[in-house]
Amino acid sequence: MLLEGLHIPLTTPFHPDGRLNLPKLAANVVRYSKSPAAGLVVLGASGEPTLLTDEETRDVLRTVAQSAAPENVLIAGISRDSVRATLALAEFASELFYDAILVGIPSLLVGTIHSESNRNRTELMFYLQTIADRSPLPVVLFSDRDRRIPIDATVELAAHPNILGLLDGAASPSEIEAILRRTATIKREVTVTTVFRAVTARMRIAAGRAPATLVSAASLGASATAAAETPPTPPLRTRTKTIGFQVLAGDTQAILESLRAGATGAASAFAACAPQACYEVFAAWKDDDQPLAEEKQTRLCAAARLAEAGPGNLKYACDLNGYFGGRPRLPLLPPTGSQRAALEQLMKQLRN
């Protein structure tokens, strides 16, 4: 699976009483599907995944799969503390035709990986390798400031044939460059469209379906009855592309520098409230218009810094830009009055 371009980490909408608001989630996804984003990250860190039950997790995964455009790459954030529970959700995501799963450090090991104990690192490696061995979907590793996968571990895991890449919200451009340099020998073939965009599982399914055409009885003769005739299905034209280990940059402040370091795309939390503005950084870089790319990057920074201070801030920024944000689920809190006023001012220049 090709991980290139902008991938939007979704927020999770709730009703005022804390229940999931699935209609608003579906509406957000439909709107994101009309943006230039290449994919959607469901229940990443900004989606409040640890505050959902497994049943709610399934409801969210199902709603997104039913609402997203077939061309959107879908990545399911399904990390659980046990391998067994994670694989159960991986199987569910596979049944919904997701394209990959997002898996990070289990909470049992948070804060211990960088200690002097080799046992904790061994447990992490066993956890991630076992999931990659048994998952029906490819794995994207997840690392951020609170749950950092060590670079050495990332490089070792990159060789696994079922691990596609890394979404890292904390890696500096120099660290991304180091990871890619140390994994440069890894080469894989992926299926892409004729214009080198990702071919998703749901695109393959859609290509196998076509609406029936009604053939009248009159056209068939007096003794015939009307029938539905399925027209030939237009083929999904594809080609192959050779790729290496793929990195999605999760740090909004360093999208451009991360792309320059070799990242294949971006998946920053701020994209949930300003997908067009984030995409414009990637587009200008892709067109090699470096002055424009730097200008687009600079205009993101102040608003992103405040919006990414917590799910409540990010959701309010979504509200300001035409997406449903709403309140976070307790114990998380909405932004203060002063934060709301500051976000209103900062988001003015980033309206879609």
Describe the residue ranges of each PLM region.
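Glycine-rich tight-turn/loop motif centered on a GG-T
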Residues: 49-54, 106-122, 190-194, 199, ...
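Generic alpha-helical structural context detector
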Residues: 8, 283, 315-319
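A general structural signal for well-ordered alpha-helical segments in protein cores
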Residues: 25, 57, 61, 86, ...
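Active-site beta->alpha loop and helix N-cap motifs at the rims of alpha/beta catalytic domains
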Residues: 1-149
